[in-house]
Amino acid sequence: MWILTTVGFFSVVQKRGDSFLTVRARIASDLDHLRKEYMPELSETVTGQGTDYPYRATISHEKFTSGMVKLMRDIRHSNFKNEVSKKMGGKREKVYSKACNDLRALEGLTKGT
């Protein structure tokens, strides 16, 4: 699952054989922000390992869910991109905006295409 937030961009998966989630990021500080603000139980960040996402940490399903609930309860903004720009800077907002624009290609697709 991809998650774009005002504290970072994450890819969350459960790897085969694991009972916990792996939270992956392209920027190490995104995991630091997530850990500091919403998920103190998130493991230390592991760097590298020759994978698509250079930074990763692990957490239980339950603690991840609790952290996401906290993050959702903190939503007070009326414009996501403006809040991203305010909290994370204009460069991050531009990357998020490009992703949003690219996802517009989904409009008009039918189920299964």
Where are the language model's segments positioned?
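Structured alpha/beta or helical-core interaction and ligand-binding surfaces enriched in interleaved
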Residues: 1-113
